Amino acid sequence: MLPGLLQCAQLRSLPVRDLAYLLTAPPPWHSGVEISRQRLLGPQGWPQLLALDADPTPLLAWLAARPTRRLGLYAEALLGYWFSQAPHIELVAANLPVRDGTLTVGEFDFLLRIDGEPCHLEAASKFYLQLDSAPHALVGPGLRDAWWLKYRKLASQLTLAQHPAARLPDGFAQLTASSRLSGWLFFPADTAPTHPAINTAACRGWWCRRQDSWPQQHPHSRWLALPRLQWLSPAQADEAATQSLAAMRAQLAQAEGPWLLAELLPDDHGVWQEVARGFVVPDSWPAPELLGTLLPRLAA
């Protein structure tokens, strides 16, 4: 497991672990204006997360009032909870649109006061697979998104306060624009990022085709298929919820689409902890028709 995620492994509640991940994970790429984890956590951030892990009822109630099946909205809800509860942060606005007549120019993810200072924070949690050695060839598993598109969009969003149509709350004229990026990047064996903006310390995994040999770190590890809303933080599971490598391969033999899998080993308390993760994709991935639609957008 990445050293930066070891603290997350101490947390047993999945939503609390996901929240800690969103606040502390290394960014997949450098935006140039990344907010520090220390500033988001504040002086008592980790004790507050431990207390929330001991009794996650308030966070669970917050999420229950905001049900979603979309990972991005789930992540936004988690961050919204933290920004509404952390004593050093004031949540002023979330998802505030900027409209120029009938045209929506963009949307502020969060407008915050952190230790009294106004901040525009753009947040994103992304998962991309490296197709080949081309610098921009990091694409989403569904081939509807790509890193280069998000990279350019984020750069634009971070300047949103400068747009003539932007209407900011009182006291935000001198705001600071920052980003909080999280997510995972997945690479074929023996490949590495090629774009200088990619963070070499990012959370990384592998990807391979279903019929290939799957990378395995330990001969006695167990495996777990991760639903989309469990993609954020490193997985934990009881042994009964896991499978052997052979059983997992058999289960996915006829499965459709990419599947995200976690490889796990038991810790000293008998909890199976993620040690690696990767996408297993069909032999036909990437689908030519979807890739053919995506690639021209990358070249634009």
Question: Regions from the language model: what does each represent?
Answer:
Residues 1-300:
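Intrinsically disordered, low-complexity Ser/Thr/Pro/Gly-rich regulatory segments
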